[in-house]
Amino acid sequence: MNTVVKLNNIFSGLPKKKKTKVLGRGIGCGKGKTSGRGHKGQKARSGVSINGFEGGQQSIFTRLPKRGFNSLFKSKYSIVNLSTIQRLIDSKKIENVSAITKQVLFNLGVIPSIKEKIKILGDGKLNTAVAIEYDFISKSAGSQVTLLSSVSEDKV
């Protein structure tokens, strides 16, 4: 069954952009006079939309109970995987594997700030022995790495 392509049966797909309906241009257009906003009221006026307002009904966020809080003193950790460190060693971006400090990781763009604490995770495998400065480490990463801790006695 061969179908011949003719000019009248070419389908180029749906239109890329739907034309916007012109509002307020007479009752004949279907969206004239009130332009789909109904009559009067706050929502009929321009520049007004009230977030969470449900027409006098108690809003959903006041019906639900308050739960939890965000601590102001929460520590933020920069997570570094072993696979990331190995990739940097393989690409010769880290030359001195005996002293991988926060400054080195910051300069390479691995961590966003030197002030943040570093947590080493054991995702991936290390092929070379490294000494790395860290604040926290997972058990799986600790078994793979010879470590130089930045907080040896300060650790709580």
UniProtKB/Swiss-Prot annotation:
Pfam families: Ribosomal_L27A (PF00828). One of its GO terms (biological process) is translation. Residues 34-43 have a biased composition (Basic residues). GO terms for cellular component: large ribosomal subunit. Gene3D superfamilies: 3.100.10.10. The keyword rRNA-binding applies. GO terms for molecular function: rRNA binding; structural constituent of ribosome. Keywords: Ribonucleoprotein, Ribosomal protein, RNA-binding, rRNA-binding. The keyword 4Fe-4S does not apply. InterPro entries: Ribosomal_uL15, Ribosomal_uL15/eL18, Ribosomal_uL15/eL18_sf, Ribosomal_uL15_bac-type. Residues 26-46 are annotated as: Disordered. SUPFAM superfamilies: Ribosomal proteins L15p and L18e. Binds to the 23S rRNA. Part of the 50S ribosomal subunit. Belongs to the universal ribosomal protein uL15 family. This is Large ribosomal subunit protein uL15. It comes from Ehrlichia canis (strain Jake).
